[in-house]
């Protein structure tokens, strides 16, 4: 049995894995889905996010709660790859593999936020404003 942790992309929530989760569970795997900060049912406000660690906090807390012998398969979609990159840096011993599905993916030379080093504030601004335009 493997343990999957599924991380959604921008402007989504854990709900986006609703078809994948039962298929993995039916195959005997354990599955954890996470709502990142201000996403899905997480009630935080997007204006409270100041750093990547703030945004990824629910994922980091989930990984921190697992025992030292637990190793998970971390799956990221889209913008979730940035949070997964941070989690892989912080908890390398708890991750057996990271899977990036049409996702931002860290390289092996530069820090995980290299691509956003000068524009992270701009990226957050875009997310804040896109979030106001999205009607579900």
Curated annotation (Swiss-Prot):
Belongs to the AB hydrolase superfamily. Methylesterase family. One of its GO terms (molecular function) is hydrolase activity. Residues 5-108 form the AB hydrolase-1 domain. GO terms for biological process: embryo development ending in seed dormancy. This is Putative inactive methylesterase 20. Keywords: Hydrolase. Pfam families: Abhydrolase_6. The keyword Hydrolase applies.
């Amino acid at each position: 049995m493997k343990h999957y942790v599924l991380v959604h992309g921008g402007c989504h929530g854990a709900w986006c894995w609703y078809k994948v989760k039962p298929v993995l569970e039916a195959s005997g795997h354990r599955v954890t889905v996470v709502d990142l900060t201000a996403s899905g049912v997480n009630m935080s406000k997007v204006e409270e996010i100041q750093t990547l660690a703030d945004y990824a906090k629910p994922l980091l807390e989930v990984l921190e709660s697992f025992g030292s012998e637990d190793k998970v398969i971390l799956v990221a979609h889209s913008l979730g790859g940035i949070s997964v990159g941070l989690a892989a840096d912080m908890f390398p011993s708890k991750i057996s593999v990271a899977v990036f599905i049409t996702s931002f993916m860290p390289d092996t030379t530069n820090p995980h936020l290299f691509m956003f080093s000068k524009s992270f504030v701009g990226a957050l601004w875009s997310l804040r404003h896109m979030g106001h335009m999205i009607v579900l």
